[in-house]
Curated annotation (Swiss-Prot):
Cytoplasm among keywords: yes
Originating gene: tsf
Protein name: Elongation factor Ts
Native species: Nostoc punctiforme (strain ATCC 29133 / PCC 73102)
Main location: cytoplasm
Keyword Protein biosynthesis: yes
PROSITE patterns listed in its UniProt record: EF_TS_1, EF_TS_2
Amino acid sequence: MAEISAKLVQELRQKTGAGMMDCKKALIETEGNVEEAADWLRKKGISKAGAKSDRVAAEGLVDTYIQPGGQVGVLIEVNCQTDFVARNEAFKALVKNLAKQAAAADSVESLLAQQYADSPGGTVEEFIKQTIATLGENIQVRRFVNFALAEGTQGVVDSYIHTGGRVGVLVELGSQSESVATNQEFQSLARNTAMQVAACPNVEYVSVDQIPAEVAQKEKDIEMGKDDLANKPENIKEKIVQGRIEKRLKELTLIDQPYIRDQSISVEDLFKQAKTKLGEEIQVTRFVRYILGEGIEKQEISFADEVAAQMGGK
């Protein structure tokens, strides 16, 4: 076997833009022949993928997977660089498959290490590298969460995707019996609840009693420091602040929101009505909302710079 020197690896990296370990593996497979190693990387879809993997990926899709029976669900965000690639069918298919596979993962790292279901013999990470090379953009699995009903409990997991994959919600509702858990009205309630969460970006908790004390105290401190209360007597100030705090905390809770399909009732009223119809206690166990690119600082690149970068990458 030919000796694989650091110089050979560096030469192949400069030629292909692939990662160091991928270049070393390619050189081993081709007995140190740089040209053959470059072809090997191209066949594997790795060439130039490494060079693209440090670009900021703030576009993409939020998607979900619900296992048949509604006992397990996944919400996932996969990022790319442009909306153009986000609308590409190959990218959409990748995200769908990743959402399904994430049901059996507990971290992004463990998901990437799985065998990719649609590409036997290769890992998820390897297939993503191939897709990067094919589509020409950085692709990152940013985050995912999976819900599974606890053993011995009844309920359903459902989801809602809004605005073409830019907002996604995963929700779990609990019931007392299997007959209610499989009831169509109960399952429709789960879907409508997910839609409600998507429509209420300020909502973070199911009910006021779930809000941590430190969050409530922070809101109180903010209100107490407002200029319009500076000259108020302390007892009046406390009453005003208490009223504002109660209003603010309700803005953070799901059950206190007006129901989007009927503004005359609250979400809490909706669940009370459902309880009467279904004959047993039901509740929102938990929910999570993803907003595409939330918290990612996007690079501001001029059109000329973008064209130059694309030309240089070819």
